[in-house]
A protein has these predicted regions:
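DPxDG-like acidic metal-binding loop motif
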Residues: 68-102
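Phosphate-handling active-site elements
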Residues: 55-62, 90-100, 115-116
Length: 242
């Protein structure tokens, strides 16, 4: 089946935060979905979740037209699990495969049309160890346009890149609310924080229709910073060199 068909079968996989989920869509409309609870073990829950939505929809995995996965930033372990699963499905079964930035998925928790053309939103994600990830998006009235790519660094530095009056939300904005203040920005509530498998699938289908599918073996998780052990090793190496 062509991915331009409104009945294209699309699977969305989201494993970048401590919840996550999987959805099966017909076009952009959800058929079946499974959401994992707080503290989910993605390595344990993802494959049974995929089997559950496929079985509930009475299809075979081989009928999938698109597999979309949240590619990061996010939980290092969750990213590896989700991306590896998407690669496996793409390589063995042949659907179009695409990775979607986690912050873009979060942006669509806010409707571009409701914000109005020209409005800005900025999901801010806690990156641990005193950093945040963020991306600034501008509404075209129909979609969110990425203006900055992923910004990664101390919250004070990242906040300088966000236009005043932008709607900021996410666990990073909440954690560093002394930086992302209501005096400078509009602040969203916790209902906007989590990326969803549904928007992963919808954006994945749109990306594939625009020619953005990738070779499954080239799909990679996007971490945007080293792990804590890697940072410690880099620090020790730098100290030895001085």
């Amino acid at each position: 089946m062509s991915t331009t068909d409104e009945t294209a079968l699309v699977m969305g996989i989201e494993t970048t935060d401590d919840r996550g989920g999987v959805v099966l869509c017909c076009g952009e409309e959800p058929l079946e979905q499974r959401e994992f609870g707080p503290g989910a073990s993605h390595a344990r829950d993802l494959l049974p979740g995929i089997d559950a939505v496929v079985r509930a929809a009475d299809i075979q995995k081989s009928e999938l037209d698109v597999v979309a996965v949240a590619e990061g930033p996010g939980s290092f372990t969750g990213l590896r699990v989700g991306v590896t699963c998407a690669k496996m499905l793409g390589y063995t079964l042949g659907p179009a495969v695409v990775g979607i930035p986690t912050l873009e998925i979060k942006a669509y928790n806010v409707e571009p049309a409701e914000e109005g053309s020209g409005a800005h939103v900025c999901p801010v994600q806690d990156a641990r160890r005193g950093w945040v990830y963020a991306t600034v998006f501008r509404s075209t009235g129909e979609r969110w346009k990425d203006l900055t790519g992923v910004l990664a660094g101390p919250p004070e530095d990242v906040a300088q890149e966000v236009p005043e009056g932008a709607l900021v939300f996410g666990d990073g904005a909440e954690k560093f609310n002394d930086v992302f203040t209501p005096e400078r920005f509009r602040t969203g509530d916790e209902s906007l924080d989590d990326p969803t498998a549904l928007w992963t699938a919808r954006l994945g289908l749109r990306r594939v229709r625009a020619g953005g599918a990738v070779d499954p073996m080239e799909l990679q998780p996007r971490y945007y910073r080293p792990t804590a052990p890697e940072e410690n090793l880099q620090r020790r190496s730098a100290q030895k060199g001085n």
